[in-house]
Each structure stands twice: as C-alpha cells, then as structure tokens.
C-alpha cells in the first residue's frame, strides 16, 4: 500500500480534549482537532496547552490531524 500524500503544518495547542485529543490552532489561523501519533504515546511525550507542535494531515479531511512532533 503506497504512502499517501500528507500535509504538515506548525501550530499551537489551544485546548486539551478527552481521549488524548487536542484543539490546535495552525499558523494559517485554522483550528483543527488532532491526536498524538503512536510513537509520541509510546515514548510518553506530554503535550500541554500552549505547546508548539507539528501537525500532519491528509488532503482528504482538513479538520483532523495527527501531532507528530512537539517543539522544545
């Protein structure tokens, strides 16, 4: 199965939601719902409100995403 095209955007976590999901405001002023990637869960990387993150999205649904990196 070929890897599909993904879009990556930096953003800031604005709100923590239930079930390890977050509301993220992207740099282009869009707000999306994102969850943490499996490697971040596995390595127990905490994401809090106000953190700068990198969000990965598919071109099919631009309202949901996956947090792949938390900037230091």
Curated annotation (Swiss-Prot):
Protein name: Translation initiation factor IF-1
Principal cellular location given in the protein's record: cytoplasm
GO CC term, one of those recorded: cytosol
Residues covered by the S1-like domain: 1-72
A molecular function GO annotation: rRNA binding
Subunit field text: Component of the 30S ribosomal translation pre-initiation complex which assembles on the 30S ribosome in the order IF-2 and IF-3, IF-1 and N-formylmethionyl-tRNA(fMet); mRNA recruitment can occur at any time during PIC assembly.
Keyword RNA-binding attached: yes
Keywords: Cytoplasm, Initiation factor, Protein biosynthesis, RNA-binding, rRNA-binding
NCBIfam families given in the database record: infA
Family in the record: Belongs to the IF-1 family.
UniProt subcellular location: Cytoplasm
Species per Swiss-Prot/TrEMBL record: Rhizobium etli (strain ATCC 51251 / DSM 11541 / JCM 21823 / NBRC 15573 / CFN 42)
Pfam families for this protein: eIF-1a
Lineage: Bacteria, Pseudomonadati, Pseudomonadota, Alphaproteobacteria, Hyphomicrobiales
InterPro entries reported in the protein's UniProt record: NA-bd_OB-fold, RNA-binding_domain_S1_IF1, TIF_IF1
Cited PANTHER family: TRANSLATION INITIATION FACTOR IF-1, CHLOROPLASTIC
Role: One of the essential components for the initiation of protein synthesis. Stabilizes the binding of IF-2 and IF-3 on the 30S subunit to which N-formylmethionyl-tRNA(fMet) subsequently binds. Helps modulate mRNA selection, yielding the 30S pre-initiation complex (PIC). Upon addition of the 50S ribosomal subunit IF-1, IF-2 and IF-3 are released leaving the mature 70S translation initiation complex.
């Amino acid at each position: 199965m070929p890897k599909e095209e993904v879009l990556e955007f930096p953003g800031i976590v604005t709100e923590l939601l239930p079930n390890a999901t977050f509301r993220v405001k992207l740099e282009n002023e869009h707000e999306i719902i994102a969850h943490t990637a499996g490697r971040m869960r596995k390595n127990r990387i905490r994401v809090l409100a106000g953190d700068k993150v990198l969000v990965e999205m598919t071109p099919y649904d631009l309202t949901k995403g996956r947090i792949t990196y938390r900037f230091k």
